[in-house]
Amino acid sequence: MVCCLWVLLALLLHLDHVACEDDAYSFTSKELKAYKQEVKELFYFGFDNYLEHGYPYDEVKPISCVPKKRNFEDPTDQGTNDILGNFTITLIDSLTTIAILEDRPQFLKAVRLVERTFPDGNFDIDSTIQVFEITIRVIGSLLSSHLYATDPTKAVYLGDDYDGSLLRLAQNMADRLLPAYLTSTGLPMPRRNIKRKWDVSEFPEFLETENNVAAMASPMFEFTILSYLTGDPKYEKVTRYAFDKTWSLRTGLDLLPMSFHPEKLTPYTPMTGIGASIDSLFEYALKGAILFDDSELMEVWNVAYEALKTNCKNDWFFANVMADTGHLFVPWIDSLSAFFSGLQVLAGDLDDAIANHLMFLKMWNTFGGIPERWNFSPPEFPPLSPLERSGAVALDNILPLEWYPLRPEFFESTYFLYRATKDPFYLNIGVHLLKDLKQRFKSNCGFAGFQNVITGELQDRMETFVLSETLKYLYLLFDEENELHNSASDVIFSTEAHPMWLPQEVRSNYKRNAKFNNSVYSSHLEICQKKDREQAGENTLSQRIVGFAKSIFHKGPPDEEATDPIIDYTIDTELPGTCSIKPHHVIGDEFWYSPMLSNFDRLFEIDSRFAATLIKPSHMHNYNAIELEPGFYNRWSNPQFSTCLIPPTTEIFELLFDLPGYHQLNPLMLENKTITFETFGGRSRLKIEKLQIYQIDYYGDLITASTFQDVSRKDIFSNACDAVASLYSPTYLYRVVAINGRILPRHGSVQIKKHSPVLTSNGTREEDEFKMDGIGINDHSQLMLECTPIINLFIV
């Protein structure tokens, strides 16, 4: 007994010594408060330097400590003039960060400065700016700041010290931007002069002939909130029409090209994805559905997300594909797509969010930031020598756009994943991001991102999102006690990280009293809607004529093109992907571990799979992987479980079905790991694994002879496989490992109901209606591909 007590005392003394030796990475409340304070100090360092060296202009240059001004000499300088309208945009965009810091004195001081800057309460400034960017940065911040100033439950509530000036300014800017929607289609022009809001004669044609999907659709979110707060529905009606009209331009695969001519509706590029030019449409479909309790927006999100998973989803990211075919268009992803993991968290798709976020962590480990564009596939041309492949020449080839201006998207997703999982893995990332901001990006008068991640050259610019988003999300990551984390309101962050909520009284008043009385915009919408009805009638008549002709001259259904099944065999360049992590954080009864370090057995798969394009620049050679920081790894990993899968040796390819009927959203996942499809129409993309004995499979398991026992190759509807069915067992089999972007768990299967397009309702094929060469069904109800069973794909 005495011996046991001595052992226990020694253990306690050892643990106390370890704790005192290094409190870092324990993530106690004391430690998190220290990190939070450091972020707060960084924010005020940047903000105060802007006020001293940049105000009243739009930005401050962080290296040279002079204002960054609008380019008045060159009106075509889009990179500058689209955002810098000569209206102190850094001041306005930073207001909500001060509110989130819960710093009432500084919030009131900043609001007063805005009021003094615009004493007449209007933006009567001769500047041509981009409608979308000013909506999210100016109108969005003013609306959110107004909500903070008028909400008695918030720490920065201003009460009698505030008279609604920010809301009036937001409405004034909106009134200057809204004429951009007075086009023949109701889709907005990309730019507007906010002084001469009705005059478009000054714009060079090339500045007005293309608008991206995000810019045409997304202002709906801020403008709808403005309608709720002012009681004037014109903002909601006009911009919601544009959102719906933009969504209607999608292809038959429910994918949207990234940009259009707003008058002619012709697409400028066939490409689609989740990054720049389209990101906010998906974001505001889901966030608008939640904030406005809007089932139609939720349907847009569900359809769009399913289409993205089916056509764009790879193991670790969403690729840019052709909107009409779903085929890969370019072999790069951009930095803005890092936001999508956070959106997936909001949608409840946590497993996939975790995997997608990891891709951007590996980029940060490699480049010290997220390059604007990164090639995930090595370029074939020009051929490079071994020396070139390891140096700057190779980096030039894999980074089409090499800058990183401290964009917030990776910070944003890290924050949302931590809130959803409470995994210290994400706190550790935040600690390193904080360290990088202090040691690598903090400059004389602000924060300078990379002009070139290859050379490490810094950029003498601090865009407004550094203070309004990047530092805000980092602060919230460490602030467990922030009022936003304990609010009874449904708070939604805008795409510019401005918190939005709608008090019930505001909702009720708007629904009860709002009247659309503005004749200019109501008449314009009526004209646009009339054109839509006429166009729909012409399309319907055309379809009837074509259908009638086909019914006379062709045997089969009226729309042959839509019902011809297509099977496309493509070799997948991606190796197998991720598996789900355990939702809890405790292994055993005594110690806490990081689920990512202890359960996620593909944590380092990206490093090997993308080694050809994750090449460290010379200035990053001493930068260690964030997840392998010794202080963090030694404390939070569980040696018993922290293992990696053996890399698979099986061949992976894709099977693409284009079938008649409709695609089923959200198929049912049963407790026995079976995904069930009631219908199997539309497009489906199956990732197929070719199984051969003694290979390592997708899940890291050895394939044994037992897999090949009791295999049937007899097609119950055809004699095409009779010859091979009577011979020896097959040398390989097939297995589905992912379907429409959903990775099947180990021992998972797929069931397709018999009434789906693969079979008719009575279980027999109708050759006149449907024929797929190479597809059969055996007497185990397994689908067969060229007489080889897909052992986990059943027709039931």
Swiss-Prot record:
Residues bearing attached sugar chains per UniProt: N86, N517, N672, N762
Residues binding Ca(2+), per UniProt: T495
Note: Present with 656 molecules/cell in log phase SD medium.
Family, as annotated: Belongs to the glycosyl hydrolase 47 family.
Top EC class, one word: hydrolase
Enzyme Commission designation: 3.2.1.24
Catalytic activity annotation: Hydrolysis of terminal, non-reducing alpha-D-mannose residues in alpha-D-mannosides
InterPro entries: 6hp_glycosidase-like_sf, EDEM1/2/3, Glyco_hydro_47, Seven-hairpin_glycosidases
Coiled coil stretches, renumbered: none
A single GO molecular function term of this UniProt record: carbohydrate binding
Functional pathway: Protein modification; protein glycosylation
A cellular-component GO term for this protein: mannosyl-oligosaccharide 1,2-alpha-mannosidase complex
Pfam families the UniProt entry points to: Glyco_hydro_47
Signal peptide: 1-20
Subcellular compartments: Endoplasmic reticulum lumen
One Gene Ontology biological process: protein glycosylation
Subunit relationships: Interacts with PDI1.
UniProt keyword terms in alphabetical order: Endoplasmic reticulum, Glycoprotein, Glycosidase, Hydrolase, Metal-binding, Signal, Unfolded protein response
Functional note: Alpha-1,2-specific exomannosidase involved in endoplasmic reticulum-associated degradation (ERAD). Delivers misfolded glycoproteins to proteasomes. Forms a complex with PDI1 to process unfolded protein-bound Man8GlcNAc2 oligosaccharides to Man7GlcNAc2, promoting degradation in unfolded protein response.
Presence of the UniProt keyword Glycoprotein in the record: yes
Catalytic residue list: E372
Descriptive protein name: ER degradation-enhancing alpha-mannosidase-like protein 1
